[in-house]
Amino acid sequence: MAKSSRENGPREPAAGGSLSGTRESLAQGPDAATADELSSLGSDSEANGFAERRIDKFGFIVGSQGAEGALEEVPLEVLRQRESKWLDMLNNWDKWMAKKHKKIRLRCQKGIPPSLRGRAWQYLSGGKVKLQQNPGKFDELDMSPGDPKWLDVIERDLHRQFPFHEMFVSRGGHGQQDLFRVLKAYTLYRPEEGYCQAQAPIAAVLLMHMPAEQAFWCLVQVCEKYLPGYYSEKLEAIQLDGEILFSLLQKVSPVAHKHLSRQKIDPLLYMTEWFMCAFARTLPWSSVLRVWDMFFCEGVKIIFRVGLVLLKHALGSPEKLKACQGQYETIEQLRSLSPKIMQEAFLVQEVIELPVTERQIEREHLIQLRRWQETRGELECRSLPRMHGAKAILDAEPGPRPALQPSPSIRLPPDAALLSSKAKPHKQAQKEQKRTKTSAQLDKSPGLSQATVVTAAGDACPPQGVSPKDPVPQDPTPQNLACHHSQESLTSQESEDTYL
């Protein structure tokens, strides 16, 4: 990888030509010019001054390009209801994924509570299972020296990742250190793939929500399951998806498709950073998080939908095309998108309503792959098949996998915990009494049918294959108690979903 190519930006193809994509051509973000200037803000000598800066709810310095203005706050009671429902799902994840996956998808579309977002991403992506299947693997990779040809490139990229965020503002700070560890570990885990610059913002977003080891396994899942081949040497997968996006655009917005065709603008010029960074360097931060919530649940179709929505609203009407008379003006229009179309509520609603399915994407993928093979030959990168979301990843998991062991998240007051512990012996005594009564009936009635015995013992012993309900994890620390006092039950048959 040419280390200086990032500063030069992407090369525009000649009219009618095609762009031979390489991962060195990833465009530099709009804030990269000021990243070098701001990277010294967090030096050790200025650490004391950092506390005086105002930080927004997402961790960005107020007034910086990453920070957002006034946001619509979710009422506290609504947030507590959301947390309670998500805690129930996470603590019974396998059951929910098996029987109520549509409900999980609906709640991901409505937004994961911030306090549980990192944990939910781990469960949705399968990163939690990968971690349990590979205990100590990250530590082993972390202790290894790494390949020198990648280490220097990674180190040069560290200060470019969200330099206005409190985690990454300091050179050599804990955020940059963890980012280096995660990216280095991936080059050792997949030495044939190495490092691509677009992996850095993906890993940085993950580190904002979880520790380094968990972020590493989520990154593995993104690279291998959600976006396989995106970060390979020749960027063949991203080129194919560019053609898929352009073909789908013809159905979603014929006006935008016709304009881009007339201008002979290669899809790689506007969608490379969108797709490879999962819009982490494009959208306002609140929109990024909502898009990622849906992406981890539903897969790459969310990335396609977001791209199509942006193209449709940026170039989808004659009025908007008046200012786009040439290639340069069109590219600038797509690089400086209107804040309205990127606003969280508007964008998410448009993405949910856009009728683009996995089947359409896969059908178009086969068409574009056939064209590629006819004109360019076989793909050099043999990546794994793409998994369309959390359910597909779970279903494709080979053989028996370890049951997810949720960390205790439900907190009960000390009195409630004491009552719960006192109630257990009483319930066990009742069960023993029922078993004794059933045995006595058998002794007195030798002709009692087997069906009658099963019916009589049904209350005492659950049927085969149905496990008794797990006890609620207990923690004597009475913190955040109000989050778990909701009278609603996720296992009940609700007439309508009260999750707002």
UniProtKB/Swiss-Prot annotation:
Region (Binding to the PDZ domain of EBP50): 497-500
Tissue distribution: Expressed in most tissues, except for skeletal muscle.
A GO MF label: GTPase activator activity
Domain (Rab-GAP TBC) ranges: 111-299
Positions bearing Phosphothreonine: T477
One Pfam family in the UniProt entry: RabGAP-TBC
Site (Glutamine finger): Q197
GO BP annotation list: positive regulation of proteolysis; retrograde transport, endosome to Golgi
Compartment list: Cell projection, Microvillus
Composition-biased stretches (Polar residues): 438-453
Residue numbers marked as site, Arginine finger: R156
Composition skew (Basic and acidic residues), residue ranges: 1-10
GO cellular component: a single term: plasma membrane
Stretches for region Disordered: 1-45, 396-415, 420-500
Coarse class of the protein's main subcellular location: other
Positions bearing Phosphoserine: S39, S40, S45, S407
Keyword DNA repair: no
Keyword terms of this UniProt record: Cell projection, GTPase activation, Guanine-nucleotide releasing factor, Phosphoprotein
Domain of life, source organism: Eukaryota
Function in brief: GTPase-activating protein (GAP) specific for RAB27A and RAB35. Does not show GAP activity for RAB2A, RAB3A and RAB4A.
Record note on quaternary structure: Binds to the first PDZ domain of NHERF1 and NHERF2.
Record's comment describing the protein's domains: The arginine and glutamine fingers are critical for the GTPase-activating mechanism, they pull out Rab's 'switch 2' glutamine and insert in Rab's active site.
Name this protein carries in UniProt: TBC1 domain family member 10A
UniProt organism field: Mus musculus
